[in-house]
Amino acid sequence: MSLANRIEEIRCLCQYKLWNDLPSYGEDENVPQNIRRCYQLLDMTSRSFAVVIKELPNGIREAVMIFYLVLRGLDTVEDDMTLPLDKKLPILRDFYKTIEVEGWTFNESGPNEKDRQLLVEFDVVIKEYLNLSEGYRNVISNITKEMGDGMAYYASLAEKNDGFSVETIEDFNKYCHYVAGLVGIGLSRLFAQSKLEDPDLAHSQAISNSLGLFLQKVNIIRDYREDFDDNRHFWPREIWSKYTSSFGDLCLPDNSEKALECLSDMTANALTHATDALVYLSQLKTQEIFNFCAIPQVMAIATLAAVFRNPDVFQTNVKIRKGQAVQIILHSVNLKNVCDLFLRYTRDIHYKNTPKDPNFLKISIECGKIEQVSESLFPRRFREMYEKAYVSKLSEQKKGNGTQKAILNDEQKELYRKDLQKLGISILFVFFIILVCLAVIFYVFNIRIHWSDFKELNLF
């Protein structure tokens, strides 16, 4: 990781903290109480998805939020290992009917289930679901039915096979379709229903499915250790059995090289969906929807680069740095930037790829495909033209050309002044902390520095 990239991440973190004001619908008194509580539940279940959902435009934002909460409720039932199968299966299969029942709640989740509270207050979600237009409700209901059936099938399979529910790569694709691909398909239908995107997007099922599969497969790779400790095995036997006779042996230090080769095989499988993700993003025309879809996809390719040939995957949950995540959020605002970020992380994977790995060729081919698709979607010559046009536009704005004059009114000047004050105070505070730490170190280790010591360094 270069120093320049680290500095850029720090800059993005400061910019995000100081100037990025996220909508606070969960605390806004002007928002109806039920909707407010739904936003609070959204924050509780997923901070990352909450950020991108809240940035969606009116008319689609609440539909996507309810869609997410409904499927998160379904997922919470599936993930709960304390629920007996005879209790779990009917709930999963009938969940699409349950969301039509006013007042329904569920209090039998395990005490350690992290999203337990969502089901305890699920009547709030149902009430807002019933307030959506019929078109939105039909999309959510249909996807919930398909997903519930798929989850029930794989839950019963895991029960029969001591936690193993995925045997072949075909099973793997099918499972990921049920738990994530359907989310991508449902979102495409919601976007088309809102009229904010082309109606034909609702029929782009293959690439919509890939959008979800890419995210899910990356998460399954990253969560190896967490899932293994919970006796949940989502890596397909068809892949891991080539490297070990027991799934748990991948954790053993003696098998580290075989484990990394297995990880490479899983990475190659996930990369097959990256090109579809880029093609899907190229079809979006609404800025907020583009951001909503692009940010998780870039996060996924960044995570894949972080876990690739990383032995820590088998011991802990590997995540990208916070500064890296913020940098992705700020930059994933157009197709050019997204292609550039995909290329950056794809090249990180290609750089770590080694000819000693039996999957070297597969990884190289998939990385090459991403390069080709990025070039076809946004050729290099157009990137240079885009950069020049963008710089020219900024220059015109600064000069005050056209109808948009770069003259700040008093209110804007006051806001900028306050922001600069905050930045200055933050910098001074950091320097103060550094000085205090140095003082403590000098005191503890009895270090004495005299002015003559500085003179000997010939600094002045």
Swiss-Prot record:
Its cofactor is Mg(2+). SUPFAM superfamilies: Terpenoid synthases. InterPro entries: Isoprenoid_synthase_dom_sf, Squ/phyt_synthse, Squal_synth-like, Squalene/phytoene_synthase_CS, Trans_IPPS_euk-type, Trans_IPPS_HH. CDD domains: Trans_IPPS_HH. It is found in: Endoplasmic reticulum membrane. Keywords: Endoplasmic reticulum, Isoprene biosynthesis, Lipid biosynthesis, Lipid metabolism, Magnesium, Membrane, Multifunctional enzyme, NADP, Steroid biosynthesis, Steroid metabolism, Sterol biosynthesis, Sterol metabolism, Transferase, Transmembrane, Transmembrane helix. GO terms for cellular component: endoplasmic reticulum; endoplasmic reticulum membrane; nuclear outer membrane-endoplasmic reticulum membrane network. Pathway: Terpene metabolism; lanosterol biosynthesis; lanosterol from farnesyl diphosphate: step 1/3; Steroid metabolism; ergosterol biosynthesis. Pfam families: SQS_PSY. It catalyses: 2 (2E,6E)-farnesyl diphosphate + NADPH + H(+) = squalene + 2 diphosphate + NADP(+); 2 (2E,6E)-farnesyl diphosphate + NADH + H(+) = squalene + 2 diphosphate + NAD(+). One of its GO terms (biological process) is ergosterol biosynthetic process. Its EC number is 2.5.1.21. One of its GO terms (molecular function) is squalene synthase [NAD(P)H] activity. The chain crosses the membrane at residues 425-445. It is a single-pass membrane protein. Squalene synthase; part of the third module of ergosterol biosynthesis pathway that includes by the late steps of the pathway. Erg9 produces squalene from 2 farnesyl pyrophosphate moieties. The third module or late pathway involves the ergosterol synthesis itself through consecutive reactions that mainly occur in the endoplasmic reticulum (ER) membrane. Firstly, the squalene synthase erg9 catalyzes the condensation of 2 farnesyl pyrophosphate moieties to form squalene, which is the precursor of all steroids. PANTHER family: FARNESYL-DIPHOSPHATE FARNESYLTRANSFERASE (PTHR11626), SQUALENE SYNTHASE (PTHR11626:SF2). In Aspergillus, the biosynthesis pathway of the sterol precursors leading to the prevalent sterol ergosterol differs from yeast. The ringsystem of lanosterol in S.cerevisiae is firstly demethylised in three enzymatic steps leading to the intermediate zymosterol and secondly a methyl group is added to zymosterol by the sterol 24-C-methyltransferase to form fecosterol. In Aspergillus, lanosterol is firstly transmethylated by the sterol 24-C-methyltransferase leading to the intermediate eburicol and secondly demethylated in three steps to form fecosterol. Belongs to the phytoene/squalene synthase family. Interacts with pof14. This is Squalene synthase. The lineage of its organism: Eukaryota, Fungi, Dikarya, Ascomycota, Taphrinomycotina.
